[in-house]
Amino acid sequence: MQDKIIVKGARANNLKNIDVTIPRDKLVVMTGLSGSGKSSLAFDTIYAEGQRRYVESLSSYARMFLGQMDKPDVDYIEGLSPAISIDQKTTSKNPRSTVGTVTEIYDYLRLLWARVGTPHCPKCGKEIRQQTIDQIIDQVLSLPEGTRIQVMAPVIRGKKGEHAKIFEDAKRSGYVRARVDGNLYELDEEIKLEKNKKHTIEIVVDRLIIRPDIQQRLTDSVETASGLTGGLVVVNLLREERDLTFSQNYACEDCGISIEELTPRMFSFNNPFGACPTCTGLGSQLKVDPELIVPDKSLSILEGAIQASGWNNIRGDGISRMYFDALAKKYHFSLTDPWETLPEDVRSIILYGTGGEKLELHYDQPRGKGVLYQPFEGICNNVERRYKETQSDASKRELEELMAECPCPTCKGKRLKKESLAVTVGDKDIDALTRMSVVDELQWVDRLELTHQQHLIADRILKEIKSRLGFLQSVGLGYLTLSRSAGTLSGGESQRIRLATQIGSSLMGVLYILDEPSIGLHQRDNDKLLATLQNLRDLGNTLLVVEHDEDTMRAADYQIDIGPGAGIHGGEVVAAGTPEEVMANPNSLTGQYLSGKKRIPVPETRRPGNGKSLKVIGAAENNLRHIDVEFPLGTFTVVTGVSGSGKSSLVNEILFKKLGVELNRMKVHPGRCDRIEGIEYLDKVVDIDQSPIGRTPRSNPATYTGLFNDIRDLFASTQEAKSRGYGPGRFSFNVRGGRCEACSGDGVLKIEMHFLPDIFVPCEVCKGRRYNRETLEVRYKGKNIADVLEMTVDEAVEFFAPLPRIRNKLQTLCDVGLGYVKLGQPSTELSGGEAQRVKLATELSKIATGKTIYILDEPTTGLHTDDVRKLLEVLQRLVDSGNTVVVIEHNLDVIKCADHLIDLGPEGGDGGGTIVCTGTPEEVAACRSSFTGQYLKKVLEK
């Protein structure tokens, strides 16, 4: 078997026809500056080719659904294994996905509960026993005399198929009717069912009217129905249109409540047989939030306290004013009174309506005047009704801004119906177990006491559960709960979950390609992750890891450094070999940082701040334990702590959202805290995250930074443009006039392929240049507008050197390390780190007020150590202007450069949520109880 993967002539994106040799069955780390071409080689070339070859081996029928995959721009690749990509972009946003379902641990838990669970009565909590035929008959005969019923046998429950044989057998056995999916059919009819839909079929065994003399006939019918289904009988009350379900298997003797036989689907919130009927298994509902309806309680109704669309403009004589005048008159309040001073009952009536009580509405319209008498439904009820009734997506989005996710009133956020939650294993229902952390669940499995018979049934299931929980703990995710929604996980967490799932699969001979698995991981947990990667390698797999973490580089068997620069300055193999060989290579920037020849310096002094501070009092979101936290203003503050310690809850959920509501008028629901003091010292909060700067190819760095407006003004001021009468709008590719109309200024045409992905092809008219011929004839210094958009930032700085307004904005893009990016590069092609730096550059180019607080969550994601150096210089510049920067970070190079640290912990999940220590990096390094301090001490001593 070949012992290496050989790549010849890779040219994807910025790769310069490179040849690479990768040893098989080794841990290979790919390094280099951000934008140097690592992902182009790892994902766009090696993974894409591995995937394409696998898809080609499938049948034409399977390929029809997967689509034709393009061959990457490479001469050939030898020795390639089936490739599995574990990146950070495929986090599921489906609200039905949880940590438990993604890892498949929940499937094993459902099986455990179905096989050894003890059912209880959902009403009284008593353990449920099997129900006899006599008990079923007694309950049916207790119905009021004259009740019309039909006894039915549910032979099929929620199964896909046409089920033609079921109908034939029933007809042959002499049955006349069947209820299919809630509708009654004669069996003489031709009943056609959709093959790929789930159906429920109930054979009507008998129809009866409740009388004392029907006992024998009812007994025969119930026994027949029970015999057809293995113990399950449905009695349908015809007039009331409701069903009574009886089971010979489980029923409460006191309440007469029976539940069906325990099956795994009964514990699935993604199946109608297990899901809560109110929220259909989501655990939450969208409800109008009064806090978002009235964000500023100091305003009066007349001043615009109410921010719901349709109710926020009452200065005229419209319908909303008519209602408010009537409410004020009836309940004796003034529209000029601040909302917070209105009596509680008045506020409740305005929000939730008058019930049946009618208002006296005086109208004065051009058509006439008069009085109407009608009730007021309340603003919350009005918004909710409009949300349900509207067909417009835009209206729905607007109304959703006034709504928040609230726990389902029926299941209290537990997702399952009450019958499913009444089944226990080891005195716990399945929801209670999934709300425990992975570490606690492992202890629960070890302590679980079962009978000998239950052990015989459950041992194999428990072994699978225990091993998968162990894998999660081994990748540093012991603080997570299985009930945690997959959409709330960070990129690093979701990647490590999929990594744990892959270890559980125990495949060998596979090529795994990972994208920065250490993201979001504290240094303490890094060793666990490395041990996991080495374990995966030792199974007989090749691991190709794109990484910037020094510990991972040192642990590698082989390292490939791509560079030397980024973008057009990268795309070459600078060094390849063992980490020691890369360190010895003078051309490798990565090697210089790894060997310590280059390093990010520790600041000589720490800023004390401007004497003012922001205080979060009583922070209690998620696992935070009513802590008080002080953020000194005018400093560079970093919030640290192990994964799951509460950093994001404190900074993103409480601090950012609360400041956003107060300063930016954002419509969000801040995390729980008593109050925040010191907001008056700030005038703006800016969250600089790694989300895209735009969702379409029309958005690019030039448009986002505002640079493109200046460039269009410049072209409009040229002599040629003036003589033709062209204004700045002529040079926009978003409006008619100067753009190419064949592609509407996109430069590409989208061809819809229906069930295949859409294909983009260059526009044949403008050849991808976006503008029409006349517009491109206008030139500045020999370049037209399309040429300028094709320039890199470095080239543009030189080109626009005599124009300070344009040059300064371009210089800020250079300062954040984006000199290699093209001005017109579509935002969809920028990485998360690049998008974040475009936002930083935009903020840098604004005039500083000195009263802004910037919040960044792990800004070093995707950044090389040299890029981190540039990022730190930019952040320090923001603080030098009098602003405050608050960063969540694990990167020790960032932590050591902070003015002030807030270390949360000591552990993750339930073991976290408290302040371990605060102070300068030197003070935290001296704190023995701080895990961050222990690692920081080593870095500061270098």
Residue spans of the language-model regions?
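Conserved phosphate-binding elements of NTP-dependent enzyme cores
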Residues: M1-K942
